[in-house]
């Protein structure tokens, strides 16, 4: 059913239907009633349209992710979608790649009132630019967050989680613990590296090596591990994602080394991949992060003056055969 058909059924112009759909107060009461009746009779999403007309809301949420190929991001999005649908909302997904121009294109939906609010998973370094584009619209940030500010956020304590992972390796007798990190424009990368280095310093370990992967992929993890094996190889590796850790495992095995006897490996995120390859990992409550982000956003939509909230959820260390 098109807007033209609704106009024909109501006996009004397409422009009048458009004004009704946009909740304009310039429409005569009798014409508004005709349009609403036509919508009802046409069975064209009657519940959604009726709600939009009553509340001046679209019941759509824009979700901007930095990398939908990242299993962690995909799981967070699943949690967002589940909670959104439970509350009568749908999501529009934008894979921004943390590119500000792509973000700008997606955010144009805010000014057109096509979406009621936005959930982002962009790099911390992009938050100031995003804030300028989003303005006062309801907004929640996932995983990447500022320590202070006006944007509500939900995530985990990355420093504590990484400290625990490195401490577990050190407690197991590992002396040469390396790290495979990623892009430092992401706050999680900086925080996890901070946790790694703090334990290395606290335990007075002589060995410290950080290799930066070009992407959050298995192939990038393989390349990073190859570099770590060149000189004075580690006896343990902590990777900031399960995909990087999976690549590291493959390189170790191809080099004829044993896991965990020669080199132990710990990942991060707690994805299905980690379970499949029996990888020790830090499990993030990814779907709960998504669900909580929706709760925060809907509260902001309903209460624009609601105070900013910073929610830190619990993580879990899962020990498997790689350590």
Task: Label each residue range with its predicted role.
Residues 1-57:
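N-terminal helix-turn-helix DNA-binding module of bacterial transcription factors
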Residues 65-75, 93-102, 154-164, 180-224, ...:
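Hinge/beta->alpha junction and helix N-cap segments in small-molecule ligand-binding domains
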Residues 86-87, 200-206, 229-233, 254-259:
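Short helix-capping segments at alpha-helix termini
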């Amino acid at each position: 059913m098109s807007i033209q058909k609704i106009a024909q059924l109501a006996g009004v112009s397409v422009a009048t239907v458009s004004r009704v759909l946009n909740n304009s107060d310039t429409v005569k009461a009798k014409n508004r009633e005709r349009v609403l009746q036509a919508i009802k009779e046409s069975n064209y999403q009657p519940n959604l349209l009726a709600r939009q007309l009553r509340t001046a809301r679209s019941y759509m949420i824009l979700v901007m992710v930095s990398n939908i190929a990242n299993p962690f991001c995909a799981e967070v999005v699943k949690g967002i979608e589940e909670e959104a649908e439970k509350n009568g909302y749908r999501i529009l997904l934008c894979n921004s790649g943390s590119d500000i121009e792509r973000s700008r294109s997606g955010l144009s939906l805010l000014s057109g009132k096509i979406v009621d609010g936005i959930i982002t998973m962009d790099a911390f370094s992009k938050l100031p630019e995003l804030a300028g584009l989003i303005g006062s619209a309801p907004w929640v940030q996932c995983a990447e967050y500022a320590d202070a500010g006006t944007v509500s956020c939900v995530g985990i304590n990355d420093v504590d989680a990484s400290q625990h992972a490195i401490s577990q390796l050190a407690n197991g007798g590992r002396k040469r613990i390396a790290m495979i990190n990623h892009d430092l424009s992401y706050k999680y990368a900086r925080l996890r590296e901070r946790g790694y280095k703090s334990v290395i310093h606290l335990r007075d370990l002589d060995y410290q090596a950080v290799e930066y992967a070009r992407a959050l992929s298995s192939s990038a993890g393989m390349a990073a591990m190859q570099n770590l094996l060149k000189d004075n190889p580690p006896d343990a590796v902590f990777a900031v994602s399960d995909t990087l850790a999976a690549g590291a495992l493959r390189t170790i095995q191809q080099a004829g080394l044993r896991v965990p006897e020669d080199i132990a490996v710990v990942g991060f995120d707690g994805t299905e991949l980690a379970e499949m390859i029996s990888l020790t990992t830090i499990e993030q409550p990814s779907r709960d992060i998504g669900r909580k982000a929706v709760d925060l956003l809907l509260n902001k939509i309903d209460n624009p003056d609601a105070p900013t909230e910073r929610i830190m959820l619990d993580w879990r260390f899962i020990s498997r055969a790689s350590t």
